[in-house]
């Protein structure tokens, strides 16, 4: 609804099959239908530009990213690599992957420089903290998402919370939707995704810190975060996520996910 309110038309699950240049612009053929446009922006992800490394005989993975060790060293003697060109280790799952982000790239550069200068330093891995802004809306993520947790067969669960970015009685309060991925066995926070407005970035950073520190939902309930009505609530959205997960882990409450509703018994027992 937010995107539509801004005049954005979403054509989902509808791929581009052909692009034709015309006298008035572009004619774009889709799987279902077609559109005419002055400009086409293809935002289809990135891939490592490692042709030089390949020519030099440096080991690459199947996606073409340079393989490095924890010291950022490649397979070639005295050659180091960092940034968008390299394969990384996921700090949560310890799986190899490709996450090209500026923050990790800068930290990798410092670690490579340390090792080149004889200072033993290791890179602890990437957890994929990222954020973007769509008009005034903020979409932020850190750690693993449910798709990854499911693919790896992790013993996980998820909790959805909808909390105000600051005290409801203070003007301008809006809700943020938070999805938290956690380990069902011990409550350890594995990932979080947030969609909201002002204040969503701060909460994602708190989740990022919590994940890096190996914190659990129980720890989230105890966090003492800055509070004044213009900035937050006495029970911060982070605390609320912790409370909800704690209630689930201690079986104070049960939750039924939206995708399970169709499988519920039809005898009014629930």
Regions found by a protein language model. Give the residues of each.
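Short, surface-exposed charged micro-motifs
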Residues: 18, 71, 179-181
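FAD-site-proximal beta/loop scaffold in flavoenzymes
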Residues: 23, 27, 34-114, 206, ...
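A conserved short coil-to-beta-strand element within the FAD-binding core of flavoproteins
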Residues: 12-24
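General small-molecule cofactor/ligand-binding pocket signal
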Residues: 9-11, 80, 157-159
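N-terminal glycine-rich dinucleotide-binding loop that anchors FAD/FMN and/or NAD(P) in oxidoreductases
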Residues: 1-14, 144-146
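Mid-to-C-terminal Rossmann-like scaffold of FAD/NAD(P)H-dependent oxidoreductases
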Residues: 85-198, 229-233, 237-269
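Catalytic P-loop NTP-binding/switch module of NTPases
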Residues: 217-223
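A short, polar/charged loop-to-alpha-helix boundary motif
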Residues: 198-217
């Amino acid at each position: 609804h937010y995107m539509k309110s801004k005049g954005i038309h979403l054509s989902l699950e509808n791929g581009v099959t052909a692009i034709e240049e015309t006298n008035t612009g572009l004619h774009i053929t889709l799987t279902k239908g077609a559109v005419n446009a002055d400009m086409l922006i293809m935002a289809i992800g990135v891939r490592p530009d490692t042709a030089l490394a390949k020519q030099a005989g440096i080991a690459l993975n199947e996606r073409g990213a340079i393989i490095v060790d924890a010291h950022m060293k490649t397979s070639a003697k005295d050659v180091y690599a960092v940034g968008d060109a390299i394969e990384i280790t996921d700090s949560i799952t310890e799986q190899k992957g490709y996450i090209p982000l500026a923050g990790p790239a800068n930290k990798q550069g410092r670690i490579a420089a340390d090792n080149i200068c004889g200072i033993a330093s290791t890179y602890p891995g990437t957890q994929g903290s990222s954020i973007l802004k769509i008009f005034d809306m903020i979409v932020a993520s850190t750690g693993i998402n449910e798709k990854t947790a499911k693919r790896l067969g992790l013993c996980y669960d998820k909790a959805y919370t909808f909390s105000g970015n600051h005290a409801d009685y203070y003007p301008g309060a809006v809700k943020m939707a938070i999805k938290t991925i956690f380990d069902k066995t011990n409550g350890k926070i594995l990932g979080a995704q947030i969609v909201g407005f002002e204040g969503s970035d701060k909460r994602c950073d708190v989740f990022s810190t919590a994940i890096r520190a190996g914190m659990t939902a129980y720890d989230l309930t105890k966090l003492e975060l800055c509070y004044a009505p213009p900035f937050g609530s006495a029970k911060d959205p982070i605390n609320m996520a912790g409370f909800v997960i704690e209630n689930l882990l201690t079986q104070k409450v049960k939750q039924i996910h939206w995708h399970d509703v169709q499988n519920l018994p039809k005898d009014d027992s629930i």
